Design a protein with these regions (language model features):
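A hydrophobic/aromatic-rich effector-binding and dimerization subdomain
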Residues: 2-27, 43-47, 113-180
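Short, contiguous, helix-prone interaction/anchoring segments in small proteins
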Residues: 31-67
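N-terminal regulatory/effector-sensing and dimerization cores
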Residues: 52-144, 148-150
Length: 180
């Protein structure tokens, strides 16, 4: 409901320690916080609690994230406002209520989000999808192709899915329940 959504937004709107450092003048993303190698690859080992297959964290605002990839699947849900992403060179504006899912082959850049641009990132290890694939069964569809691509290494044709679902109430309620 609306009250729950307002509580979620209020909770997610709080300035984090990382965001405060940015507001105090830090001009670049602290790559060590997210990545351990030379290349800027977001590392689940640094971001996910040990033993978890999936976790949720608020998107860091006020700073541009340079081109990076992930060693996990990232699902971004736009709670309020919008964010601009460039995925493998293609510009995507993620608006309130929309969902963007990236596999490990996606190279992502993110423009700075403002104070009222509230997004949550779901970090999902590829192993999470093993069971999902068994449940989907044999029929061919875009989601299945995407999940199979998440489990493979190397180039796959479909590296992101963008769902414009702001008007799909059951999906909105499901995501709200996941976040809260």
């Amino acid at each position: 409901g609306i009250i729950v959504k307002q509580e979620i937004i209020a909770d997610l709107s709080r300035i984090t320690e990382e965001e405060q450092a940015i507001l105090d003048g830090k001009t670049e993303v602290e790559k060590e916080r997210y990545s351990s190698g030379q290349k800027f690859v977001m590392d689940a080992g640094k971001l996910l609690e040990r033993g978890k297959l999936i976790d949720i964290r608020p998107h860091t605002r006020f700073i541009r994230f340079p081109a990076h990839s992930h060693n996990y699947v990232e699902m971004i849900y736009m709670c309020q406002g919008s964010t601009v992403h460039t995925i493998n060179g293609e510009r995507i504006e993620l608006k309130t209520g929309e969902l963007l899912i990236l596999n490990q082959n996606a190279v992502q850049e993110i423009e700075p989000a403002g104070r009222d641009d509230i997004a949550v990132n779901f970090l999902i290890l590829p192993e999470f999808f093993d069971q999902t694939l068994r449940m989907i069964g044999a029929e061919e569809n875009q989601l299945k192709d995407f999940i199979v691509g998440c489990l493979k290494s190397g180039e796959v044709p479909l590296c992101y899915l963008h769902y414009r679902i702001a008007d799909v109430l059951p999906v909105q309620n499901l995501i709200e329940n996941l976040v809260w």
